[in-house]
Design a protein with these regions (language model features):
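Proline-aspartate-enriched helix->loop->beta-strand connector
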Residues: 229-240
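N-terminal accessory targeting/assembly segments
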Residues: 1-109
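Hydrophobic anchor at the beta1->P-loop junction of P-loop NTPases
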Residues: 163
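Hydrophobic positions on the alpha1 helix immediately C-terminal to the Walker A/P-loop
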Residues: 174, 178
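The conserved Walker
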Residues: 167
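P-loop NTP-binding catalytic core
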Residues: 87, 91-158
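Conserved lysine of the Walker
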Residues: 171
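P-loop NTPase switch/communication element
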Residues: 182-229
């Protein structure tokens, strides 16, 4: 069941990429779905697939290599970057501008694409990113039960709790499962502040992830969402990423 779910999510993330890349990776989905954490597109560099134990590179014939082989790798083109960027923005870049200036775009299902390029600055503030050279697609996964060991400890805490860890260590995955447990098993009123859309994975008002009985503030600024929640939703617990 988990393997099927991971493959479905991985395939959904691949469909956000340009066709030139997605069509080469789709046949590898059953093999890669459980392990790939990130898909990294770097202009004029080989396509990289980041796994917990290693980084692999896609060859032109659809194979994988853990070393870069001269002349054999699939090199990311400018068209690949542009097409992927437009795709992850649903061909509505203007509507995603608030996310873009913060260096990321959240996609359907909670997958997130980090963006790197040249900053357009006005009065000391970044107002846009142009000439994008790197896109990092982080695969969102659900692992129900991963927060079981934390639940009993956290439910007894009076005060705040900070969960920290290295990048890709599973913080968001654990936090999502905690939200589910606290709002169902714990029967707490939980306000879930999902500023980047990674926890609930909201798409057109529908949650793509199981976040239990939480009240979700999707794409809100954290401070504003907290004020709204406290004023009107009477939360016993406020969760943010």
């Amino acid at each position: 069941m988990l393997a099927e779910q991971n493959e479905k999510r991985f395939t959904a993330a691949l469909n956000c990429l340009c066709k030139n890349i997605s069509r080469r990776l789709l046949p590898l989905a059953p093999k890669l779905a459980d392990s790939v954490q990130e898909i990294r597109l770097r202009l004029s560099r080989p396509l990289a697939l980041v796994c917990p134990d290693n980084t692999y590179y896609l060859t032109q014939n659809g194979g994988l290599s853990n070393t870069i082989l001269d002349g054999a790798m699939l090199v990311v083109s400018k068209a690949d970057i542009v097409d992927t960027f437009n795709n992850i923005c649903n061909y509505s870049v203007y509507n995603r501008q608030n996310e873009i200036v913060n260096g990321f775009v959240t996609m359907y299902g909670g997958h997130r694409a980090g963006i790197c390029g040249t900053a357009v600055v006005n009065n000391g503030k970044i107002v846009n990113i142009r000439d994008i050279t790197s896109i990092n697609v982080r695969i969102a996964r659900e692992h129900k039960g991963c927060a079981d060991s934390f639940y009993n400890k956290i439910i007894a805490v009076s005060g705040g709790v900070l969960i920290c860890g290295a990048p890709c260590s599973g913080k968001t995955t654990v936090l999502r499962d905690l939200a589910r447990l606290l709002s169902t098993k714990g029967k707490k009123n939980v306000a879930l502040i999902d500023e980047r859309g990674e926890l609930a994975g909201t798409a057109s008002g529908k949650f793509q992830n199981d976040i239990g009985m939480c009240d979700v503030y999707d794409s809100y600024n954290k401070s504003e969402a907290m004020l709204h929640a406290i004023r009107s939703m009477a939360p016993e617990i406020v969760i943010c990423d």
